[in-house]
Amino acid sequence: MPTLIHQRVRAAQAGTNPYVICRMPSGWAVLGDQQFISGYSLLLSDPIVPDLNHLEEKSRLQFLRDMTLIGDALLAVTDAFRINYEILGNDAPALHAHIFPRYMNEPERRRKYPVWTAYSKEERDSRPFELSKDKELMERIAHMIKQKL
């Protein structure tokens, strides 16, 4: 059953996905639909597989390396002090990783917990992706990633 991840990967392959930061060896680095935490990104596996365990070891390691390269880039171009990584796939069974920069200006009571539980849905939906606002950050992230590839 095709998921939003499938749709986004197809759009990235076609060059029509505005969220794309850059192509990586294991997939696509993209900015998240919601930017309530600036720099929230994802890595979408290409080719699409249901989960990490469906990849051969070499591809699995490449996906994890690419995921951390996105985190390294976020640390370099934002004021984040830490990166949270999540690979869930429960709602959309297609391999993708959520990459959340965490900032010291977040209230401590939120900073200590996963984003999904620390913020309400209304808060998470409060700042949608806007290419005109987010393009510069996407370019800086892409530049840092490409330096390490």
Task: Locate each region found by the language model.
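HIT superfamily nucleotide-processing domains
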Residues: 1-149
